[in-house]
Design a protein with these regions (language model features):
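Catalytic alpha/beta core domains of metabolic enzymes, predominantly
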Residues: 114-206
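Active-site beta->alpha loop and helix N-cap motifs at the rims of alpha/beta catalytic domains
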Residues: 3-132, 136-151
Length: 206
């Protein structure tokens, strides 16, 4: 039986709208955001979609969003190619970009990628820096090839939890109902043992 804590954390849904303007947001699109603001919780800015993500351009777009007074959280994401995005920065350049984005005014949240074989202390330092700037962190992991076994999923969530982000996000590719059930089981078990908000995504139509 699910506890009240599990029901709350597993049923709390946030609606995010994802945008990827090159340098500035058109007035038409800004008007659309205002029009549909009651259906939006988070505005995600995907800067990996840009040919060259420059911090000044990111700051300019965020200022445009902030000036709308929508009272929505602004999430900045640079998704690398290895985790399903278009970003081709080296790991060092990726870390440096996020370090600078964290310092931009009005950034509320940032996505930080987790990879099992990557040196974790760089990620931990980045998360600590974000928290010092009052920026929440979504630590995310994507597997587009498979759904790991239940035990591995639980271990993955636990390792991510140890880095002290605000959200744990795991997205996997299921090929059977059993894969989906394993993700849900890992999600349920993790929700009851960690303080973070926990997210699980099955990237198929199963």
């Amino acid at each position: 039986m699910l506890s009240e804590k599990e029901v709350f954390k597993m049923s709390e849904v946030k609606i995010a709208v994802t945008i990827a303007p090159e340098n500035e947001i058109s007035p038409t699109f800004l008007n659309e955001l205002v029009k549909y603001q009651t259906s939006i919780d988070i505005i995600e800015l995907r800067v990996d979609q840009w040919a060259t993500p420059r911090v000044d351009d990111v700051a300019n777009v965020i200022d445009n969003l902030y000036e709308l007074n929508l009272n929505k959280k602004i999430l900045v994401t640079y998704r690398t190619q290895s985790q399903g995005g278009k970003g081709d920065l080296s790991f060092d350049a990726y870390i440096k970009l996020l370090e600078r984005i964290i310092e931009i005014d009005h950034v509320d949240m940032i996505d930080v990628e987790f990879e099992i074989n990557r040196q974790s202390h760089y990620i931990e330092n980045l998360i600590n820096q974000a928290h010092k700037n009052d920026v929440e962190v979504i630590l995310s992991y994507h597997d587009f090839q498979k759904t790991p076994p239940l035990a591995q999923l639980k271990q993955l969530y636990f390792k991510m939890h140890q880095m002290n982000p605000d959200y744990l996000k795991v997205a996997v590719m299921p090929y059977s109902k059993e894969d989906v059930l394993n993700l849900l089981s890992a999600l349920s078990a993790t929700v009851d043992t960690v303080p973070q908000q926990v997210i699980g995504i099955a990237m198929s139509k199963l």
